[in-house]
Amino acid sequence: FGGILRLVHVSNTGVAFSVGDSLPDTVRRFLFAILPLVVIGIVFAVYFKNNTFTKLQRWAICGIVGGGLGNLIDRFARAEGVVDFIDVDIPNIAVPGLFSLERWPTFNVADASIVVCCAILIVSFMKTAGAESGRKPDGI
């Protein structure tokens, strides 16, 4: 796709940006498998006990949970880690002395679902909170 988008095969034993991939196996399994199951359980409990979510918020929560479950299934099914395969070129981002980024870290559809739905949920909560207080939040 002209170098902007590449399909690659990367096994990621960590989480976003491969954070934690150098941790011991038992610690990784707890942090990246057991803990997410607990968090998903809590999200489900809140989701089904709360009747104040808008339809958009409910869809966003489903997208987050679906992405999380997709990554968990991949993590349990593959000892070598979650498969990431979408590699996107971005304009060079650099903060002198801190970091530079020439390509976005490789990700998968579940990651995209989680990130996009989290953004939708945050904006939706901000709009809902602004509407309840009688004003719109700045910039929205």
Feature map (PLM): residue ranges:
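Alpha-helical transmembrane bundles and membrane-interface segments of multipass inner-membrane proteins
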Residues: F1-I140
